[in-house]
UniProtKB/Swiss-Prot annotation:
Could play a role in regulating gene activity in the proliferative and/or differentiative pathways induced by NGF. May be an autocrine factor that attenuates or amplifies the initial ligand-induced signal. The keyword tRNA-binding does not apply. Gene3D superfamilies: Leucine-rich Repeat Variant. GO terms for cellular component: nucleus; sarcoplasm. One of its GO terms (biological process) is adipose tissue development. Residues 23-33 have a biased composition (Low complexity). The keyword Coiled coil does not apply. Residues 49-61 have a biased composition (Polar residues). Expressed in a variety of tissues. Residues 1-69 are annotated as: Disordered. This is Interferon-related developmental regulator 1. Residues 1-10 have a biased composition (Basic residues). Keywords: Developmental protein, Differentiation.
Length: 451
């Protein structure tokens, strides 16, 4: 959709004045040269058509199109806020598709730019819209609403405002997660949202324990029964169980030591059964969760002893060198890469350090807790993760990065290295990486795959 910022200027009063989304949409449609007699609330088709004729402020995709380029232009903060006001109005539209698009547009904007003051003033309105869409919406709309709730809490950070959001939305999210008749995709997104919002906002230990129990009741349904000796077959519920397990693992990292000990006793001997699931994503989620549990256990007791270590390492080694012809090559490569690291963590207490670069800064991920936390927020924020690592005080506190670094354009320019120096650095890094990977690579893993 073309960018029509200047065309919107004369009509700003019509949408910001709270006259209703339908009136704003109809006015914008007339200004855009459409001479039809549009009735936005007559039915869903009319409402969708109205939205398609709205000027730039109501087009959620315009955030993705404009991106950082728009945010660098003069006066763009006002334009961005004007677009967001229009999208907030459209969350009340009668059309489900219009509401969903508006929710996604707001989420994309909040994921790509810090707008703390703007949403602080409108947090109650946004919370009401999310609550309404979660209660009355269907699958895609509920997913969009839950995703927006996560980003909203990330923007606000820990505090009374986020606590109020969790207090309002928490019971609804829990109800959807446990509702067997609800869409599986919606339940999956709500499980992730519930974990993220609780991680950020909860200040009540009983509420934290209640959330852990809710998530446990979901993913433990994938555990093998005592009499079962066969492989766990994936079901439509597997995606929900994966999201619940990952959200549960995230919350476990902020639990008191006594609670962590209880959870370790409950799950340490049952969680390995998920490694036999025929879904590669479940196997990977279970493996990474096990590595994190070992890290927590050894952090509490340096001489921690696991009784079934031999059988567990055999299972992990088999997954790290899996050559099963009945599995996709991409899945096998992904699985082998992950389980080589998991095996090293369990056997040698080792973690392969990763470096995340954002702007002029670097962050080193040197433990499973940090990796899991980063992966969770990366899943929620997508491409906006790097921006939030630079600007979001909450995330910088989580990853111990200190206050945001404020650098002007001239300073940034002097920090850049020349192309030749960058080439030398990349060549050396490539050579070192190749040597390191060749040591870990199992050269026999792919033998026989093409026969």
């Amino acid at each position: 959709m073309p960018k029509n910022k200047k065309r919107n200027t004369p009509h700003r009063g019509s949408s910001a004045g709270g006259g209703g989304s339908g009136a704003a949409a109809a006015t914008a449609a007339t200004a855009g040269g459409q001479h039809r007699n549009v009735q936005p609330f007559s039915d869903e088709d009319a409402s969708i058509e109205t939205m398609s004729h709205c000027s730039g402020y109501s087009d959620p995709s315009s955030f993705a199109e404009d991106g950082p380029e728009v945010l660098d232009e003069e006066g763009t903060q006002e334009d961005l806020e004007y677009k967001l006001k229009g999208l907030i109005d459209l969350t009340l539209d009668k059309s489900a598709k219009t509401r969903q698009a508006a929710l996604e547009g707001i989420k994309n904007a909040l994921a790509s730019k810090m707008l703390y003051e703007f949403i602080l003033e409108r947090r109650m309105t946004l919370t009401d819209s999310i609550e309404r869409c979660l209660k009355k919406g269907k699958s895609d709309e509920q997913r969009a609403a839950a995703a927006l709730a996560s980003v909203l809490c990330i923007q606000l950070g820990p505090g009374i405002e986020s606590e109020e959001i969790l207090k309002t939305l928490g019971p609804i999210l829990k109800k959807i997660i446990c509702d067997g008749s609800a869409s599986m995709q919606a339940r999956q997104t709500c499980a992730t949202c519930f974990g993220v919002c609780c991680f950020i906002a909860t200040d009540d230990i009983t509420e934290l324990y209640s959330t852990l129990e809710c998530l446990e009741n979901i993913f433990t349904k994938s555990y093998l029964k005592e009499k079962d000796t066969t492989v766990i077959c994936s079901t439509p519920n597997t995606v929900l169980h994966i999201s619940s397990l990952l959200a549960w693992t995230l919350l476990l990292t902020i639990c008191p030591i006594n609670e962590v000990k209880k959870k370790l006793e409950m799950h340490f001997h049952k969680l390995p059964s998920l490694l036999s699931c025929d879904d590669v994503n479940m196997r990977i989620a279970a493996g990474e969760s096990l590595a994190l549990l070992f890290e927590l256990a050894r952090g509490i007791e340096s001489d921690f002893f696991y009784e079934d270590m031999e059988s567990l390492t055999q299972m992990l080694r088999a997954l790290a060198t899996d050559g099963n012809k009945h599995r996709a090559k991409v899945d096998k490569r992904k699985q082998r890469s992950v389980f080589r690291d998991v095996l090293r963590a369990v056997e040698e207490r080792d973690f392969p350090t990763e470096t995340i670069k954002f702007g002029p800064e670097r962050m080193y991920i040197d433990c499973w807790v940090k990796k899991h936390t980063y992966d969770t927020f990366k899943e929620v924020l997508g491409s906006g993760m790097q921006y939030h690592l630079q600007s979001n005080e909450f995330l910088r506190n989580v990853f111990e990065l200190g206050p945001p670094v404020m650098l002007d354009a001239a300073t940034l320019k002097t920090m850049k290295i020349s192309r030749f120096e960058r080439h030398l650095y990349n060549s050396a890094a490539f050579k070192a990486r190749t040597k390191a990977r060749s040591k870990c690579r199992d050269k026999r893993a792919d033998v026989g795959e093409f026969f």
